[in-house]
Regions:
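Long, charged/polar, soluble alpha-helical segments
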Residues: 1-106
Length: 106
């Protein structure tokens, strides 16, 4: 699967999971969930153009975006884990791993 296809697939998964997190968690957990939304927004900014980026520029153009999104997910995961929402924190960890693997493949 191409980098651009994986990027879009991760974004789609992140957006779907974010919606589910809002359904599962109490209203008090919305601040960490906002970080999940921000991570999706970071990725969404390049979603349309990702397939048009020349192979040689993929790392320099996508790495900063992926790193920022990963950082936001990490902060959300830690906050949710601290609040006792381990299951959702574990699911966010899985999303982080998808981004990490994509970053390594750039």
């Amino acid at each position: 699967m191409s980098i651009s296809a994986r990027y879009r697939q991760i974004l789609e998964t992140l957006e779907e999971q974010s919606d589910r997190f809002y359904e599962r968690l109490p209203v008090e957990a919305t601040k960490p969930l906002r970080l999940v939304d921000q991570a999706a927004e970071e990725l969404q900014a390049q979603a349309d153009a990702v397939g048009e980026i020349p192979q040689i520029q993929l790392e320099s153009r996508l790495a900063p975006i992926i790193i920022r999104a990963h950082g936001k997910l990490d902060r959300a995961r830690v906050a949710l884990d601290d609040e006792g929402h381990e299951r959702v924190a574990g699911q966010i960890w899985e999303l982080e791993q998808l981004l990490y693997r994509l970053l390594n493949d750039l």
